[in-house]
């Protein structure tokens, strides 16, 4: 227990005066100048949430002698003669900016030490980096746990988590004051999903910060338990650490193996745990016995209930065998089928038939959900037949073709890593004919007449390569095309999901 407390203390910072940058101009501009987003794009927010406006309003509040907040009657709340709701929203957004700057600077200074690590981290920012990792590791594992991360139903839990890192009493008094205004803090059971609607519509930046802080705290404890469950403890933990620090781990492995045992592979017989988080959910993939997997399940439940005071039932975590289970992940449909191969072995006068089971990760384009998303965006009907986009009919021909090509190109880059290309080409076919029907609608003509006037081959080449066309028409004609049909190309410069995936 003492080792666990010491571990958490090392990961937590101690900011004594969090309000200081808001009241003293010299400090806030230094922080704003040094602040850059190294990991994700900055969250968009309105220009009215500028630091200069926040500082001026904070100065007015600081100079105000009579400032009374009526908890039960928010209409009486005024701020320097103006509406309290507008100014409290701006100041609360300013708090989110300042705290985000401080924590991002701490994260950069503690996690990325040296230029080489920064370059390595940026090389694995792509959302597609997880799929080659799955291809390398997932086939050797046997169980998968779907974890739905519970969210605190009361704001006090989030504030208590924030108090672990910040020791500024005035900051918590003021942030509680704003929360009192938006909602009755004393209510024991707030409405369902109230926290999400409160933050996502009014204070998106402070919501993302508090949520990420809560997840960071939960994953820090999980990392501690994960390292303690393995005999070969990790020296570093970053995104895709298996690849970034591969050579350093090999050196460390050799040192450990020569001192403690005679067999190097002894360490690889221990627990294999891989963790991925996305969209408020997480995937825990293990190579373990059912007993140890259920043990991890109760670890998570007790962690949420005892440490965060959040109720989490057994239905929060589902455990499945990978060989008998398929799942959706980031717009792909993943499965690990068992391919049975029979090998004949000849030994002198006897021959033997040996059955070998080979696992392979299949990344399939979910054709039906994608057609539904295309139908919602008016590219096709419910049956999957292409239709025109009347909203774009008033644009020029160049703009119409450019928009469709951009959508088709983004779709191709995102789904080029699919194992089977037929569904992939069907979606591109829908986009192509939707473009042709939109152009024909604009020129008040039919598709056949419009294609006769326009060079159809040129438009066809814009949407498909030569291999695409042959694979769509003759999917299994030659060995070369069959190799292309099965090939996968992962684009490692994609930071966001495809737009169609948002509708899945």
Curated annotation (Swiss-Prot):
Keywords: Chloroplast, mRNA processing, Plastid, RNA-binding, tRNA processing
Coiled-coil boundaries: none
GO molecular function: RNA binding
Subcellular location field: Plastid, Chloroplast
Pfam family of the protein (one): Intron_maturas2
InterPro entries referenced in this protein's UniProt entry, alphabetically: Domain_X, Maturase_MatK, Maturase_MatK_N
A GO cellular-component term linked to this record: chloroplast
BP GO terms, sorted: mRNA processing; RNA splicing; tRNA processing
Keyword rRNA-binding: no
Sequence similarity: Belongs to the intron maturase 2 family. MatK subfamily.
PANTHER family: MATURASE K
Role noted for this protein: Usually encoded in the trnK tRNA gene intron. Probably assists in splicing its own and other chloroplast group II introns.
Name of this chain's protein: Maturase K
Species annotation: Vigna unguiculata (Cowpea)
Gene, per the UniProt record: matK
């Amino acid at each position: 227990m003492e080792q666990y407390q010491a571990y958490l203390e090392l990961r937590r910072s101690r900011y004594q005066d969090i309000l200081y940058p808001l009241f003293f101009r010299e400090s806030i501009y230094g922080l704003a100048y040094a602040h850059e987003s190294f990991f994700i794009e900055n969250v968009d927010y309105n220009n009215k949430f500028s630091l200069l406006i926040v500082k001026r309003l904070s100065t007015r509040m600081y100079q105000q002698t009579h400032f009374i907040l009526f908890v039960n009657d928010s209409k009486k709340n005024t701020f320097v003669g103006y509406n309290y709701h507008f100014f409290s929203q701006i100041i609360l957004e300013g708090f989110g900016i300042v705290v985000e700057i401080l924590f991002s600077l701490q994260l950069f200074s503690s996690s990325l030490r040296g230029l080489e690590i920064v370059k390595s981290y940026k090389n694995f920012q792509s959302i597609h980096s997880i799929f080659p990792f799955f291809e390398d590791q997932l086939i050797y594992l046997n169980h998968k746990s779907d974890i739905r991360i519970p969210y605190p139903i009361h704001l006090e839990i989030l504030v208590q988590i924030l108090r672990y890192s910040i020791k500024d009493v005035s900051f918590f008094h003021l942030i509680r004051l704003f929360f009192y205004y938006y909602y009755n803090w004393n209510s024991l059971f707030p409405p369902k999903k109230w926290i999400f609607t409160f933050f996502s519509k009014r204070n998106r930046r402070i919501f993302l910060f508090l949520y990420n802080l809560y997840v960071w705290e939960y994953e820090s404890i999980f990392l501690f338990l994960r390292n303690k469950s393995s005999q070969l403890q990790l020296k570093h933990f970053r995104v895709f650490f298996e690849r970034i620090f591969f050579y350093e781990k090999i050196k460390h492995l050799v040192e450990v193996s020569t001192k403690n045992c005679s067999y190097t592979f002894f360490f690889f017989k221990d627990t294999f745990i891989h963790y991925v988080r996305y969209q408020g959910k997480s995937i825990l993939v293990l190579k373990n016995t059912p007993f140890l997997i259920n043990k991890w399940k109760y670890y998570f439940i007790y962690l949420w209930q005892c440490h965060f005071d959040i109720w989490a039932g057994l239905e929060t975590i589902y455990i499945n065998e990978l060989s008998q289970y398929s799942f959706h992940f980031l717009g792909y449909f993943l499965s690990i089928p068992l391919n049975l191969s029979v090998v004949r072995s000849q030994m002198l006068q006897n021959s033997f038939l040996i059955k070998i089971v080979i696992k392979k990760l299949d990344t399939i384009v979910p054709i039906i959900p994608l057609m539904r998303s295309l139908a919602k965006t008016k590219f096709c009907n419910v049956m999957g037949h292409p239709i025109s986009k009347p909203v774009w009919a008033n644009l020029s021909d160049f703009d119409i073709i450019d928009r469709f090509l951009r959508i088709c190109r983004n779709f191709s880059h995102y789904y080029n890593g699919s194992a089977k290309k037929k569904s992939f080409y069907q979606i591109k076919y829908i986009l192509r004919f939707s473009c042709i029907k939109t152009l024909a609608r604009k020129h008040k003509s039919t598709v056949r007449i419009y294609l006769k006037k326009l060079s159809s081959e040129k438009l066809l080449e814009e949407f498909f390569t030569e291999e695409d066309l042959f694979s769509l028409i003759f999917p299994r004609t030659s060995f070369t095309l069959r190799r292309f049909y099965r090939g996968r190309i992962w684009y490692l410069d994609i930071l966001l999901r495809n737009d169609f995936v948002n509708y899945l």
